[in-house]
From Swiss-Prot:
Subcellular location: Cytoplasm
Keyword DNA repair included in the entry's annotation: yes
List of residues binding Mg(2+) 1: 7, 138
Active-site annotation: 7, 66, 138
Binding site for Mg(2+) 2: 66
Molecular function GO labels: crossover junction DNA endonuclease activity; DNA binding; magnesium ion binding
An example Gene Ontology CC term for this record: Holliday junction resolvase complex
Species whose genome carries this gene: Herminiimonas arsenicoxydans
Gene name per UniProt: ruvC
The name this protein goes by in its record: Crossover junction endodeoxyribonuclease RuvC
Length: 180
């Protein structure tokens, strides 16, 4: 199963692609999508188009994205939510099942503790995927989201893979459940 992880951000969105075969995780690719110094709609378009290009290039079976946390600054939270929405639109537009995880869940899955620092996440991602170098923070976070999904989202992914067929029958997957 090929998993695309996304760490959304208005200026920089991280992506990471891994493959899970049995209990083995393999690194495929990672990187960042940097938006131009432009108005909000152009930045969101860059995220949407770039995530779609990542999907077309690596052809993941499913995707996972980090949930937005409520920041001290409500405006920052709203902007992050819009960047996340642009990424989700690209994922759903490619008929991918999208799982969502909090930063706490990702840190627990990767490091073993929810209050881990970014450097600890980077280090564990490097170790878990046997990377020769330390990934950048945004790419490491995205790979962490993918790793979190690999550990906890297998059943959800299988259900999500059936989503196009279920839609033809008037059913859809919502919150890990089938609804009509």
């Amino acid at each position: 199963m090929k998993i695309l992880g996304i760490d959304p951000g208005l200026r920089t969105t991280g992506f990471g692609v891994i493959e899970k075969q049995g209990n083995k995780l393999s690194y495929i690719a990672s990187g960042t999508i940097k938006t131009p110094d432009a108005d909000l709609p152009q930045r969101l378009k860059t995220i949407l188009v770039s995530v779609a290009e990542v999907i077309a290039t690596y052809k993941p079976d499913c995707a996972a994205i980090e949930k937005v946390f409520v920041n001290v600054n409500p405006q920052s939270t709203l902007l992050l939510g819009q960047a996340r929405g642009a990424a989700i639109c690209a994922l759903v537009g490619a008929d991918l099942f999208v799982a969502e995880y909090t930063a706490l869940q990702v840190k627990q899955a990767v490091v073993g503790q929810g209050k881990a620092q970014k450097a600890q996440v980077q280090d564990m991602v490097q170790r878990l995927l046997k990377l020769s170098g330390l990934p950048g923070t945004d790419a490491a976070d995205a790979l962490g989201v993918a790793i979190c999904h690999a550990h906890s989202g297998e059943a959800l992914s299988m259900l999500g893979a059936l989503a196009p067929e279920l839609a033809k029958k008037g059913l859809r997957v919502r919150g890990g459940r089938l609804v009509g």
